Amino acid sequence: MNWTLRLIAYCTFLVFIAGCSSGGTSTAEGPNVVEVTARGLTLEAPDSIASGWTTFQLKNESDMTHFAVLERMPEGIGVVEQQEVVAPVFQEGMNLLNEGDVDSAMAAFGKLPPWFGEIVFMGGPGLIAPGRTAEATLYLEPGTYVLECYVKTNGVFHSYNPSPDGYGMVHEITVTADSSGAPAPTSTMDLTISSERGIEVGGDVEPGEHTIAVHFEDQVVHEHFIGHDVHLVRLQDDTAIEELAAWMDWTQPTGLQTPAPAEFVGGTNEMPAGETAYFTVDLEPGNYAWIAEVPDPVGKGMLVEFTVPAAGESAGSESGD
């Protein structure tokens, strides 16, 4: 059994034994808007927000590409445990993968606590280039959540801080029982992602501001421990699609390693099957791709190129598989 299959088997084991299917208090900017700022290798965000439909605005004020995945933690578990017993394990395993020692990396990943399989990834703003803002809307139940960015620089996950005096690029948020009362957004485009058919988008894409509904038809554990998601990337004439596709696999030494090979403009991180997330983006004329952060997105049908035409022109799209 190769190492990627062993990764799948181990993560699936964690999920099944868990029985899982899926500094000071501050407040949010508004009843349903949460401002998150990526500054350096930190995520700044409120400590407590209301439940219900919530829009996260990730402002990237750093010089690196980031994202902010929202993870619902098991009861009694928070950012302290995540930083003490999860982040170091992943970094240890990544160090070994960087050295080409797959067997030892697998042994390192085996140190993950059983409750790791109980973490539920609930979306959040997708990959976003420096100087840009990503906006994603999702429905949150009360509980303890951790925002995380695990993009890498020099082989080190942003969510891991080698200094014992500080945390990595993570932030704990308590979602209270008080409802935001906000309605679900109204979409201008609909996109479906599944492990069977990849990314599917209906209709032509027109320029302008869009609210894109991302429907997670299913969810599976891929070779890199986690599920599929949807990001939007703007392509240039010199963008190497093979390099971009390979970059989406964090288990590779160059995967999710800064600088990014293209300009990301938003999206949504992974969610359980049956969930819907929304993200807002202003589409200027040009070439783009929908892409998932999974190993071999082309082979999975999770890299789809398309063109946003200038006003009055016809749109075009093509699958990346």
In which residue ranges do the predicted regions lie?
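Bacterial N-terminal signal peptides that target proteins for export
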Residues: 1-9
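Residue-level signal for mature regions of secreted extracellular proteins and peptides
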Residues: 13-14, 142
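C-terminal motif of bacterial Sec signal peptides marking the signal peptidase cleavage site
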Residues: 16-19
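Bacterial signal peptide processing site
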Residues: 21-23
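N-terminal low-complexity, Pro/Thr/Ser-rich intrinsically disordered segments
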Residues: 26-38
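Extracellular/periplasmic metallocenter environments
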Residues: 35-71, 110-199, 203-207, 212-225, ...
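Contiguous segments within soluble domain cores/interaction surfaces
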Residues: 60-106, 209, 216-250
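Short amphipathic beta-strand segments in non-cytosolic proteins
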Residues: 232, 256-264
